[in-house]
Amino acid sequence: MALRAAAGMHPRSLEGARVGLPNTWHGAVVRHADEIVGMGRVVGDGGCFFQIVDICVHPEHQGRGLGKRIMADLVAAIRERTPPGSYVSLIADGEAHRLYEQFGFAPTAPASIGMYWRP
């Protein structure tokens, strides 16, 4: 929760984290002096659909390639463990699309657009 806040990400409830984190399909963390300074997760149904979420690096550790290391770990797990034809998506905030493009992700527009709803 502290890393999300430090990186300027939208806050999540403690209750939501307690339910959601154990359902992570694959996760990656980067530690510095026993502190988590970077993270990323893959969530999904385990067969057809996967989403990369929670990619962030603490501002004091940005610009060192940690985001790229996290993405490389997540993409490697996806390539190794998902069935053929799986669909992997993510939402790119700000300039993060530049990182994701390095791993083969492409905008879906104009064929489709991402949408969200917060109940």
Question: Where does each model-flagged region fall?
Answer:
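A conserved beta-turn-beta hairpin within the catalytic core of GNAT-like acetyltransferases
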Residues: 44-52, 62, 84, 110-111
